Amino acid sequence: GWRDWLKKGKEWIKAKGPGIVKAALKAAVQ
């Protein structure tokens, strides 16, 4: 479900760092 996806996303964010988070958000908006 989406909760599992969200949990994976949070773990991925912690691993990759805030720079990639900003890039992902920018891509999602477009």
UniProtKB/Swiss-Prot annotation:
Q: From what organism does this protein derive?
A: Neoponera inversa (Ant)
User: What GO molecular function annotations does the UniProt record carry, in alphabetical order?
Assistant: toxin activity
Tissues and organs where the protein is expressed, per its UniProt entry: Expressed by the venom gland.
Q: Where in the cell is it found?
A: Secreted
Q: What does this protein do?
A: Shows a broad spectrum of activity against both Gram-positive and Gram-negative bacteria. Also has antimicrobial activity against S.cerevisiae. Has insecticidal and non-hemolytic activity.
> Hey, which family's this protein in?
Belongs to the ponericin-G family.
Keyword set for this entry? Answer: Antibiotic, Antimicrobial, Fungicide, Secreted, Toxin
Q: Name one GO cellular component term.
A: extracellular region
Q: Which GO terms describe its biological process?
A: defense response to bacterium; defense response to fungus; killing of cells of another organism
Q: Which domain of life is it from?
A: Eukaryota
Please report the name of this protein according to its UniProt entry.
U1-poneritoxin-Ni3b
